[in-house]
């Protein structure tokens, strides 16, 4: 029974675990546009971002990284990313995280297709980022108990993401309904204005023709 339960938990964790690992190139420009990645993070979660980049000092490029959220908070800002970097921070409220990179040519460097930095990014959040081995030792938990706690945390993350998406959908729906109402009111106002204008034009022309004795 214990083996079956543990196997089921491992299967569940395999389904719930999402590997956030990306490899990409960022070309160096004199006036570069930000290259951004976006990820939802639930409230009260630990976030760990690991970077590994190519390049070296004096290669004519300066790669910078900034991590912000949809509430306007800045969680990390690194002006010269070289080699391996690791950033860890806590997120108090549910938000969309933006991880943005800029690769800028240093003064005097010539822009070319060979001027670029290759980046390997690993992004872990919540249950992925928590150290359950340390938690297991600190609380004298059985391996299956640690797996259960991890599965529970994953489920809470998924619930948080669903609630966030539902709230965002409701907000968009309310915005659409408000916009539709405004468009409808504007259409009514336009129709009434045109109707009044037509009546006024008819009365004006009637008065004009009467003054010219063209109609009785």
Curated annotation (Swiss-Prot):
Membrane-side (Lumenal) residue stretches: 22-184
Protein keywords: Endoplasmic reticulum, ER-Golgi transport, Golgi apparatus, Membrane, Protein transport, Signal, Transmembrane, Transmembrane helix, Transport
Compartments (UniProt record): Endoplasmic reticulum membrane; Golgi apparatus membrane
Organism from which the protein derives: Schizosaccharomyces pombe (strain 972 / ATCC 24843) (Fission yeast)
Annotated protein name in UniProt: Endoplasmic reticulum vesicle protein 25
Transmembrane stretches, start-end: 185-205
This protein's encoding gene: erv25
Record GO biological process: endoplasmic reticulum to Golgi vesicle-mediated transport; Golgi organization; intracellular protein transport
An annotated GO cellular component: endoplasmic reticulum
């Amino acid at each position: 029974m214990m083996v079956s339960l543990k196997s089921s938990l491992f299967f569940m964790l395999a389904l719930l675990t999402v590997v956030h690992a990306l490899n990409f190139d960022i070309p160096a420009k004199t006036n570069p546009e930000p290259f951004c990645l976006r990820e939802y993070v639930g409230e009260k979660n630990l976030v760990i971002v690991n970077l590994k980049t190519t390049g070296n000092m004096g290669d004519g490029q300066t790669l910078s990284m900034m991590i912000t959220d949809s509430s306007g908070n800045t969680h990390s800002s690194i002006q010269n990313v070289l080699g391996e970097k690791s950033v860890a921070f806590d997120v108090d409220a549910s938000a969309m995280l933006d991880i943005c990179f800029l690769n800028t040519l240093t003064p005097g460097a010539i822009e070319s297709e060979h001027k670029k930095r290759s980046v390997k990014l690993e992004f872990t959040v919540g249950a992925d980022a928590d150290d359950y081995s340390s938690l297991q030792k600190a609380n004298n938990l059985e391996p299956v108990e640690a797996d259960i706690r991890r599965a529970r945390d994953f489920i809470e993350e998924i619930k948080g993401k669903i609630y966030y998406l539902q709230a965002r959908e409701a907000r968009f729906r309310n915005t659409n309904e408000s916009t539709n109402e405004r468009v409808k009111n504007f259409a009514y106002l336009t129709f009434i204005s045109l109707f009044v204008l037509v009546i006024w034009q008819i009365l004006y022309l009637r008065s004009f023709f009467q003054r010219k004795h063209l109609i009785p």
